Amino acid sequence: MRIILLGAPGAGKGTQAQFIMEKYGIPQISTGDMLRAAVKAGSELGKQAKEIMDAGKLVTDELVIALVKERITQEDCRNGFLLDGFPRTIPQADAMKEAGINVDYVLEFDVPDELIVDRIVGRRVHAPSGRVYHVKFNPPKVEGKDDATGEDLTTRKDDQEETVRKRLVEYHQMTAPLISYYSKEAAAGNTQYRKIDGTRKVTEVSAELATILG
């Protein structure tokens, strides 16, 4: 079972990726983790990636595809894998197809921008423990204080409204075209494309995924 997850930051992909990995026993392949692992292992591709990154440049699509191909031959990918954060663009999706990396399911998590802003901007964190609260959906007992320690809660830099809106604009410009790309692929019988309503409770979304994936 080979799966691609699509959706804006804050659409709930991370939570559902965890559910899919545990239920179906397939690994999540994150391009960032893969690059770091290749560099650390000192493989041929890792050396190339390190040179590019050390020069402050972006790693090419060709190199990332080569890394994905190498990664999915490993034993833990025998029953499939989950791609999150890749492909991000049409050229990357085309390159994957040309490299013979076929995908069974493309799952799009659909959440309106305003709800995403609401979800992310309302997050409050207790940095020492990693506990996460939300001013509206999961408030602490005392406003601005951690339940267990009474210490102050903070807002992550990435969770500020301006940053969130900027990331959403980038997502719509770069990644949203993949939605029509994979819809066409599905119409041609090359994959199954499903749009998931990500505004519902986590358990409801997980239940729908279990029905889709079988």
Swiss-Prot record:
Pathway: Purine metabolism; AMP biosynthesis via salvage pathway; AMP from ADP: step 1/1. Consists of three domains, a large central CORE domain and two small peripheral domains, NMPbind and LID, which undergo movements during catalysis. The LID domain closes over the site of phosphoryl transfer upon ATP binding. Assembling and dissambling the active center during each catalytic cycle provides an effective means to prevent ATP hydrolysis. Monomer. Residues 122-159 are annotated as: LID. Keywords: ATP-binding, Cytoplasm, Kinase, Nucleotide biosynthesis, Nucleotide-binding, Transferase. It comes from the Bacteria. GO terms for biological process: AMP salvage. One of its GO terms (cellular component) is cytoplasm. AMP binds at residues 31, 36, 57-59, 85-88, 92, 156, 167. The gene is adk. Its EC number is 2.7.4.3. Its main location: cytoplasm. It is an enzyme of class 2 (transferase). Residues 139-160 are annotated as: Disordered. It comes from Serratia proteamaculans (strain 568). It holds the Pfam family ADK_lid. Residues 30-59 are annotated as: NMP. Belongs to the adenylate kinase family. This is Adenylate kinase. It catalyses: AMP + ATP = 2 ADP. Residues 142-160 have a biased composition (Basic and acidic residues). It is found in: Cytoplasm. ATP binds at residues 10-15, 123, 132-133, 200. Catalyzes the reversible transfer of the terminal phosphate group between ATP and AMP. Plays an important role in cellular energy homeostasis and in adenine nucleotide metabolism. CDD domains: ADK. The keyword S-adenosyl-L-methionine does not apply. GO terms for molecular function: adenylate kinase activity; ATP binding.
